[in-house]
Every structure is written in C-alpha cells, then in structure tokens.
C-alpha cells in the first residue's frame, strides 16, 4: 500500500438493511392473566423467554410457589440485565405484568441500556383463563383470578412501548377456543 491507505471493502449486494431506529435490540414484555396463553405463545414461536414460572421451578422446584415474589423478580431482572449487558438483540419476559407499575422497572431497565420495548398483550377473558388453568392442573383460586383480572390494565404507548401487539382468542364452532394473533 502506498501512503498507508487501506482500500475499503466492497459493500455486499445483499447487505442487511439498517434498522430505521438505532438501538441495541428489543425487549418484549408479555402481559396477561395466568392461563391467557403467554407461555404457549412463546413455545409455538420457538422462543425461550425469561420466565417467572421457570425461575420458580428452578429455585423452589414448584412453578406455583408464590411466597418469594420479590426474590423471583429481582433474579429475573438480573437475568435480563445480564442479557442486555451481553447485547443480546431479542429479549422476552414471560410474566403477568398486569399493571403499568409492574411493567415500569422492565421498561426503565431496557431503556437504560438503549433497548426498544414492545408489549405483547394477551387480551383473554378471565373465564377462558380459568378454564385453561383447570385443564392444565394448575389452579389459581377463582377469587384470586378475578382480583388479578380487576388489576389488569392494557399497555399504552405512554408507558414507553414502541409497539403493542394484541393476542386474542377466537371462538370455534363447538365453543372451544384457540389463540389468534
């Protein structure tokens, strides 16, 4: 090379498009009642989310253990933080995230690390959620489910979401339900 200049490599013809919004990646928060289909949706899409149920299973050998919520969620946030520090481009959180207050710490953490935040809202009637829960052998008492349904608030862009996807169920002929997107 004369003069120390380095020729720039040719740009490949099929270079990936640059995202319109510069950032490190995305955090997707699932939002919905127990039994609304959050975990099933992730399984169907072959996605392995950070899951409060899975963490309870790992820590306490019981996905239904509810006595140590602060411990579960502080560990779950630490796991997400580790993924953000490692610059993992896609991050999914599988938890109920019922209220703006519940979602705030996730959104703040993601934004602090320069990540985009999207909501995946499972808008499913409480009766269907309770029926599904009974079928899978996990029983959240009806009064607790109804209390949770009363707390559930749909996500809004004002919370900091850049995109909100709503997942609903559609009725089949025999009254059975299946998820729809």
What is the role of each PLM region?
Residues 1-16:
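Long, low-complexity intrinsically disordered regions
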Residues 12-14, 19-20, 24-31, 36, ...:
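Conserved GTP-binding G-domain of TRAFAC-class P-loop NTPases and closely related GTPase folds
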Residues 21-24, 28, 63, 67, ...:
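A short glycine-/small-residue-rich loop at the edge of a beta-strand within enzyme catalytic domains
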Residues 35, 54-56, 97:
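Short, glycine/acidic-enriched loop or turn micro-motifs at the edges of active sites
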Residues 39-89, 128-130:
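Conserved substrate/cofactor phosphate-moiety recognition/catalytic segment
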Residues 58, 98-138, 147-156:
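ATP-dependent NMP and nucleoside kinases share a basic, alpha-helical "lid"
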Residues 67-121:
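Glycine-rich phosphate-binding loop used to anchor ATP phosphates in small-molecule kinases
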